[in-house]
UniProtKB/Swiss-Prot annotation:
The gene is MALSU1. It comes from Homo sapiens (Human). Signal peptide: none annotated. Coiled coil: none annotated. InterPro entries: Iojap/RsfS/C7orf30, NT_sf. Required for normal mitochondrial ribosome function and mitochondrial translation. May play a role in ribosome biogenesis by preventing premature association of the 28S and 39S ribosomal subunits. Interacts with mitochondrial ribosomal protein uL14m (MRPL14), probably blocking formation of intersubunit bridge B8, preventing association of the 28S and 39S ribosomal subunits. Addition to isolated mitochondrial ribosomal subunits partially inhibits translation, probably by interfering with the association of the 28S and 39S ribosomal subunits and the formation of functional ribosomes. This is Mitochondrial assembly of ribosomal large subunit protein 1. Associates with the mitochondrial ribosome large subunit (39S) via interaction with MRPL12 and/or MRPL14. The interaction generates steric hindrance that is expected to prevent premature association of the 28S and 39S ribosomal subunits. Interacts with intermediates of the mitochondrial ribosome large subunit (mt-LSU) (recruits the mitochondrial ribosome and complex I assembly factor AltMIEF1 and NDUFAB1); regulates mitochondrial ribosomes assembly. Interacts with MRPL12 and MRPL14. It is found in: Mitochondrion matrix. GO terms for cellular component: cytosol; mitochondrial matrix; mitochondrion.
């Protein structure tokens, strides 16, 4: 090997290292901009709904066939998270939940604020769907949005009733949502259970009123046994 070949062999690793460093530097410089676009604050109202309806965003939320139970979905794979990103993006709260349910055409949305002394959850949400497919679609969409917007400290999602046809329960920690068919919702009446509570039990425990056996209701056909009463007008 001549002198030219030896020089080329010595310079090749240096040139390769410099090329890799420049590519990595450009990628790191572009990362804050991409992260800022991902976590920019959006209003919960109509503007947020329009942002959610963009093709890329909707495709990412509705591309998978079923519900997931793990907290980190495929949306967040490979994406670095930071404490700053956890606090600058839109917050997944009760207003966001109601907006998402309305966007998915949920019916008869009922939000109940649970007293703190119960130590169960902050909000209890009950909604109705038109079919089993509608219930699962609403639950899947809300869960995907939660995973996309959640912070590191937020709890994992718990889903109950994935194999049922008429009732789904999704526990987000601070919010618990029940998605039910109208007939199932009418049977269990969760609204009364969580609003009336003990008062509803008291009403059920009241004994029915009965009338005495000698109580006469109506006019008898045989009036012979009725003693006439003389009325005096003054």
């Amino acid at each position: 090997m001549g002198p030219g070949g030896r020089v080329a062999r010595l310079l090749a690793p240096l040139m390769w290292r410099r090329a890799v460093s420049s590519v990595a530097g450009s990628a790191v410089g572009a990362e804050p901009g991409l992260r800022l676009l991902a976590v920019q604050r959006l209003p919960v109202g109509a503007a947020f709904c329009r942002a959610c309806q963009t093709p890329n965003f909707v495709r990412g939320l509705h591309s998978e066939p079923g519900l997931e139970e793990r907290a980190e979905g495929t949306v967040n794979e490979g994406r670095p998270e930071s404490d700053a990103a956890d606090h600058t993006g839109p917050k997944f709260d009760i207003d966001m939940m109601v907006s998402l349910l309305r966007q998915e055409n949920a019916r008869d949305i009922c939000v109940i604020q649970v007293p703190p002394e119960m130590r169960y959850t902050d909000y209890f949400v009950i909604v109705s769907g038109t079919s089993t497919r509608h219930l699962h679609a609403m639950a899947f969409y809300v869960v995907k949005m939660y995973k996309h917007l959640k912070c590191k400290r937020d709890p994992h999602v718990k889903i109950e009733g994935k194999d049922t046809d008429d009732w789904l329960c999704v526990d987000f920690g601070s919010m618990v949502i029940h998605l039910m068919l109208p007939e199932t919702r009418e049977i269990y009446e969760l609204e009364k259970l969580w609003t009336l509570r003990s008062y509803d039990d008291q009403l059920a425990q009241i004994a029915p009123e009965t009338v005495p056996e000698d109580f006469i209701l109506g006019i008898e056909d045989d009036t012979s046994s009725v003693t006439p009463v003389e009325l005096k007008c003054e």
